[in-house]
């Protein structure tokens, strides 16, 4: 039998990225924070639901803050320093997620609202009667 050459386990080298983008999608039910490089390749992400919040607590500003802290801490392995923030959606976690990214230690260079606004497209959901 032929001897198979053993492969030595290679350590995966993380690419170093100085500038990145943070995409915050704040819906009424959840907040999703994705940190990408300049080309849009995801480096890390976190959600309010994945951070341990369930039900109505998912849609709180504190849950968005925890999600942003988790995504920011995971992206620090790539050497990120500056973030450009894109916020989408009307949810309660918009501002607290930005503040949390700032508190993690990133320098926020730009904040852009990219909430999609229809040009009289689909009919919106009916108003809630509580």
Curated annotation (Swiss-Prot):
One of its GO terms (molecular function) is rRNA binding. One of its GO terms (cellular component) is ribonucleoprotein complex. Keywords: Ribonucleoprotein, Ribosomal protein, RNA-binding, rRNA-binding. GO terms for biological process: translation. Gene3D superfamilies: Ribosomal protein S11 (3.30.420.80). It comes from the Bacteria. PROSITE patterns: RIBOSOMAL_S11. SUPFAM superfamilies: Translational machinery components (SSF53137). Part of the 30S ribosomal subunit. Interacts with proteins S7 and S18. Binds to IF-3. Located on the platform of the 30S subunit, it bridges several disparate RNA helices of the 16S rRNA. Forms part of the Shine-Dalgarno cleft in the 70S ribosome. Belongs to the universal ribosomal protein uS11 family. PANTHER family: 40S RIBOSOMAL PROTEIN S14/30S RIBOSOMAL PROTEIN S11 (PTHR11759). This is Small ribosomal subunit protein uS11. It comes from Shewanella baltica (strain OS155 / ATCC BAA-1091).
């Amino acid at each position: 039998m032929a001897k198979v050459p053993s492969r030595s386990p290679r350590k995966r080298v993380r690419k170093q990225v100085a500038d990145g983008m943070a995409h915050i999608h704040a819906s009424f039910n959840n907040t999703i924070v994705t940190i990408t490089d300049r080309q849009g390749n995801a480096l890390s992400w976190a959600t309010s639901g994945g951070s341990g919040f369930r039900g109505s607590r998912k849609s709180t500003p504190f849950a968005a803050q925890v999600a942003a802290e988790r995504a920011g801490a995971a992206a620090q392995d790539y050497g990120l320093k500056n973030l450009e923030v894109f916020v989408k959606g009307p949810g309660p976690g918009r501002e607290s997620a930005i503040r949390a990214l700032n508190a993690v230690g990133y320098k926020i260079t730009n904040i852009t609202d990219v909430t999609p606004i229809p040009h009289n497209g689909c009919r919106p959901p009916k108003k809630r009667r509580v």
